[in-house]
Amino acid sequence: MSTSRKLKSHGMRRGKNRAPHKGVKRGGSKRKYRKGSLKSRKRCDDANRNYRSHL
């Protein structure tokens, strides 16, 4: 019983999460990086790192 339950939940989770996530990642991140220059990306990373270190 536990195994079948696990499989069901796993399948449901995968179906619900995987498709939208992939779409968002493909449409948003890739396009953003392409449009924005490497410099701006680096600056964003640095800012994030500093913010994290402060916290």
Swiss-Prot record:
GO cellular component, one term: nucleosome
A GO term, aspect molecular function: DNA binding
A single GO BP: heterochromatin formation
Protein name, UniProt field: Spermatid nuclear transition protein 1
Pfam families reported for this sequence: TP1
Function, as annotated: Plays a key role in the replacement of histones to protamine in the elongating spermatids of mammals. In condensing spermatids, loaded onto the nucleosomes, where it promotes the recruitment and processing of protamines, which are responsible for histone eviction.
PROSITE patterns (alphabetical): TP1
Protein family membership: Belongs to the nuclear transition protein 1 family.
Tissue: Testis.
Chief site of localization: nucleus
PANTHER family recorded: SPERMATID NUCLEAR TRANSITION PROTEIN 1
Positions of the UniProt region annotated as Disordered: 1-55
Compositionally skewed regions (Basic residues) per UniProt: 1-42
Cell location: Nucleus; Chromosome
Record InterPro entries: Nuclear_transition_prot1 (IPR001319), Nuclear_transition_prot1_CS (IPR020062)
PTM-bearing positions, type Phosphoserine: S9, S37, S40
